[in-house]
Curated annotation (Swiss-Prot):
Family named by the database record: Belongs to the HisA/HisF family.
Keyword Cytoplasm included in the entry's annotation: yes
PANTHER family linked: IMIDAZOLE GLYCEROL PHOSPHATE SYNTHASE HISHF, IMIDAZOLE GLYCEROL PHOSPHATE SYNTHASE SUBUNIT HISF/H IGP SYNTHASE SUBUNIT HISF/H
Sections of the chain in a coiled coil: none
Active-site residues annotated for this sequence: D11, D130
InterPro entries assigned to the protein according to its UniProt record, in alphabetical order: Aldolase_TIM, His_biosynth, HisF, IGPS_HisA/HisF, RibuloseP-bd_barrel
Subcellular location: Cytoplasm
Name of the protein described by the UniProt record: Imidazole glycerol phosphate synthase subunit HisF
EC assignment: 4.3.2.10
UniProt KW keywords: Amino-acid biosynthesis, Cytoplasm, Histidine biosynthesis, Lyase
Top enzyme category: lyase
Length: 257
């Protein structure tokens, strides 16, 4: 059995790490490099950095802090933010990122997924999906440009359809960001993640809702995800990664130690 991964998420805005609730009202929580170093020291398996306003503001993630992170940590990390071309992706990988993630640009141009996969290989292409439960239609739908509340818009895609589409086009991993659960620390959306798991043949990373150690246990056991991403519980030191790993190991979950 492959070991499950714990992945702290660092949302970046204007050169600082920020955190919001349900993708709104972001507040500054710290500096990029010190937080990255702290999580690596605590035992994180990898890190994800999202430049949350890059796509909406028509720019690419700032490469200067990418190189500084690469110099400070010895665990894999993934970078996202406005990546639209092979050359932009190549530059970020050259600056030290191990994976690149695309979200809104893939929705605008789905062929980007295939082009990146052809150039760099499936293993370093991650697709982020911002999924929102629409109570009116009783369905899960994909939203775009979610890093800027004023720019956020609905798309034509139902979440499960988009999950299938990005796999056909060659993605290597999927991060399912459950917007309704984001930042509220009430637990992962086991129902939605289980539905996606049933049609997802690539590694699936759960994102949105972690509040207790038991939430991590539940999402690994019940939704059978490959990794769990979290932000506020780590930023606010509610949960220590090393202690979380010990807890999960005691619950008979295969975890990297």
């Amino acid at each position: 059995m492959l070991a499950k991964r714990l992945v702290p998420c660092l949302d970046v805005k204007d050169g600082k790490v920020v955190k919001g609730v349900q993708f709104r009202n972001h507040e500054i929580v710290g500096d990029i490099v010190p937080l990255a170093a702290r999580y690596a020291e605590e035992g994180a398996d990898e890190l994800v950095f999202y430049d949350i306003t890059a796509s909406a503001h028509e720019r690419v993630v700032d490469k200067s802090w990418v190189s500084r992170v690469a110099e400070q940590i010895d665990i894999p990390f993934c970078v996202a933010g406005g990546i639209k071309t092979i050359s932009q992706a190549r530059e970020l990988l050259a600056f030290g990122a191990d994976k690149i993630s695309i979200n809104s640009p893939a929705l605008t141009d789905p062929s980007l997924i295939s082009r990146l996969q052809d150039e760099f290989g499936r293993q370093c292409i991650v697709i982020g999906i911002d999924s929102f439960f629409d109570a009116t239609s009783n369905s899960y739908k994909v939203k775009q440009f979610t890093g800027d509340e004023a720019a956020t818009k609905d798309t034509q895609w139902f979440t499960q359809d988009w999950v299938e589409e990005v796999q056909k086009r060659g993605c290597g991993e999927i991060v399912l960001n459950v917007m309704n659960q984001d930042g509220v620390r009430g637990g992962y959306d086991i129902k939605q993640l289980s539905l996606v798991r049933a049609i997802c043949d690539v590694p699936l990373i759960a994102s949105g809702g972690a509040g207790t150690m038991a939430h991590f246990r539940d999402v690994f056991i019940e939704a059978k995800v490959d990794a769990a991403l979290a932000a506020s519980v780590f930023h606010k030191a509610i949960i220590n990664i090393g202690e979380l790993k010990a807890y999960l190991a005691a619950e008979d979950i295969a975890i990297r130690r």
